[in-house]
């Protein structure tokens, strides 16, 4: 599971997830990418499930880049606990995803294999995604 090795502050407030992604919105490393269309908090388990789906489909060929990292702590209180008595303990970590963010990148495989692998990864994720190629985004910029 992905999580920070050490953090300056253990607990964070929730914050707002508004607007489009202005950083991490281009295919920077690979040839193909998986772009988020919706906003969400993505857990490290969801990221790992998508990564396994990609690596299982491309077998030995290709290189995978994970462009997101779960660095936001989410706290939870035990079940049937009364309100008050402080903020709960850190339960898990999430990555804050905005629309337009590239989640995964892939290189070194045929286009049809890359497309199928990224489609399988998208099915594991809680949001709608689209598959983009490096040349598609370069033409738009």
Swiss-Prot record:
One of its GO terms (biological process) is translation. GO terms for cellular component: cytosolic large ribosomal subunit. Residues 1-21 are annotated as: Disordered. The keyword Ribonucleoprotein applies. Transmembrane segments: none annotated. Keywords: Ribonucleoprotein, Ribosomal protein, RNA-binding, rRNA-binding, tRNA-binding. GO terms for molecular function: rRNA binding; structural constituent of ribosome; tRNA binding. Binds 23S rRNA and is also seen to make contacts with the A and possibly P site tRNAs. Belongs to the universal ribosomal protein uL16 family. Part of the 50S ribosomal subunit. HAMAP family: Ribosomal_uL16. This is Large ribosomal subunit protein uL16. The lineage of its organism: Bacteria, Bacillati, Chloroflexota, Chloroflexia, Chloroflexales. The gene is rplP.
